[in-house]
């Protein structure tokens, strides 16, 4: 097993230009593929999850050209749903941002499809999405375990209807239905059962749909009305914002050991909810300065917070390791959906935080972290989860080194993360 030991970092200072957002990159690729016309996507994220989407689109007959560096992609739209001449099996790794939207899009396409992935993907629920698609008369069969991939889809023309969808596990299920609904023949009303998690990710979906000329009526996130017979219209250029979740590690590092750190690619104008990670740092004591497309943090002594972080579920993981440098006990609440991500992140974070000496309480949907007087050197297991690896790199901001097992798992969203961290480390 490969390991990376990070020696103690004395100070953090500098500027970071963020890679493109994973959430926006895969949404943009799929919508551009369904659109009328040719779209040029810039600042596309170069990562495993994006490669899985690109490979799937190629198998589905979508033509695109990718720049040598991988950050620009020109997509020739299909002008609607896909049409596969022969049965296809699409391997999507552990990319939820590919699995869920493609499941919906292929249910409304012509052809037979199997969607599968790596072992962890087969543990990530998809049942609520399949149940919702069944209300549109989709034909989807579980091939191994009920409610989980792999699935077999017999695609056909779907008609709009009133759909009830459980919003309590993942916002990606709603995103998937929203993205296909405008292309159906009749109108669709989507009603949310329970509390909708991760609302900012729905805002991302609605924003990109609007950019591609499709409208949705949002009734306070309790229901959505989508007119049928709409079509996505290609954009000459769509620039993917920097990844706000990836920004969190550098912002936290600046808050802990700054110096001054500026991240470019997100700011006041960003559509991503994870930009509000900076607000949490400010509540903990950091000094934050906002511009339209950048955020600057200046390090100050940090104190613990007790907050509902359902609105920033990915970035909230970074607060769990930032808590190691704050005075008092930090509690992160309403984060049950950590359990259905790339790994059971609540359990993983609790386990690894204890290794470095923290006192941790792991609840069903919350975690409390009390830092030790001094951190212990530990080998951090990363569970093939990019965010666990990046979160625990912050331990090196102490007087203690940290060893990251399987550091290349960051390739899912940020292949050169450790190089970027070194650039701002003094």
Swiss-Prot record:
EC number: 2.5.1.19
Binding site for 3-phosphoshikimate: 22-23, 27, 170-172, 198, 314, 337, 341
The protein's annotated pathway: Metabolic intermediate biosynthesis; chorismate biosynthesis; chorismate from D-erythrose 4-phosphate and phosphoenolpyruvate: step 6/7
GO molecular function: 3-phosphoshikimate 1-carboxyvinyltransferase activity
Catalytic activity, reaction form: 3-phosphoshikimate + phosphoenolpyruvate = 5-O-(1-carboxyvinyl)-3-phosphoshikimate + phosphate
Keyword hit for Calcium: no
Protein name listed in UniProt: 3-phosphoshikimate 1-carboxyvinyltransferase
Subunit organization: Monomer.
Gene: aroA
Entry GO terms, CC: cytoplasm
């Amino acid at each position: 097993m490969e390991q990376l030991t990070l020696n103690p970092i004395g100070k953090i200072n500098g500027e970071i230009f963020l890679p493109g957002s994973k959430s926006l990159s895969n949404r943009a690729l799929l919508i551009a593929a369904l659109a009328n016309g040719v779209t040029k996507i810039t600042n596309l994220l170069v990562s495993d999850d994006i490669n899985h989407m690109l490979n799937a689109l190629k198998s589905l007959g979508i033509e695109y050209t990718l720049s040598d560096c991988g950050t620009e992609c020109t997509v020739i739209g299909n002008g609607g749903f896909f049409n596969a001449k022969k049965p296809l099996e699409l391997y999507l790794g552990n990319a939820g941002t590919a699995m869920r939207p493609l499941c919906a899009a292929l249910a409304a396409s012509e052809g037979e499809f199997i969607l599968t992935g790596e072992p962890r993907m087969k543990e990530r629920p998809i049942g609520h999405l399949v149940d919702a698609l069944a209300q549109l008369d989709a034909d989807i069969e579980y091939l191994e375990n009920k409610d989980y991939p792999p699935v077999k889809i017999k695609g056909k023309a779907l008609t709009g209807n009133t759909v009830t969808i459980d919003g309590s596990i993942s916002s990606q299920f709603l995103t998937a239905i929203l993205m296909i609904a405008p292309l159906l023949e009749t109108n669709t009303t989507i009603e949310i059962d329970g509390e909708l998690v991760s609302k900012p990710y729905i805002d991302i979906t609605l924003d990109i749909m609007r950019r591609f000329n499709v409208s949705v009526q949002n009734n306070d996130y309790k229901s959505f009305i989508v007119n049928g017979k709409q079509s996505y219209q290609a954009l000459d250029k769509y620039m993917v914002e920097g990844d706000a979740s990836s920004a969190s590690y550098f912002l936290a590092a600046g808050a802990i050991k700054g110096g001054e750190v500026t991240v470019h690619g997100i700011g006041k104008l960003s559509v991503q909810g994870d930009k509000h990670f900076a607000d949490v740092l400010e509540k903990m004591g950091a000094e934050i300065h906002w511009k339209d497309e950048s955020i600057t943090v200046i390090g100050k002594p940090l104190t613990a917070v007790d907050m509902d972080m359902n609105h920033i579920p990915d970035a909230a993981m970074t607060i769990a390791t930032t808590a190691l440098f704050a005075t008092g006990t930090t509690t992160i609440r309403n984060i049950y959906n950590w359990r259905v991500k790339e790994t059971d992140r609540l359990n993983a974070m609790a386990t690894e935080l204890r290794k470095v000496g923290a006192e941790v309480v792991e609840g069903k949907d919350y975690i409390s972290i009390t830092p030790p007087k001094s951190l212990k050197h530990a080998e951090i297991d990363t569970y093939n989860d990019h965010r666990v690896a990046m979160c625990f790199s912050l331990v090196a901001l102490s007087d203690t080194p940290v060893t990251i097992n399987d550091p290349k798992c960051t390739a899912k969203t940020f292949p050169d993360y450790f190089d970027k961290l070194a650039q701002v480390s003094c």
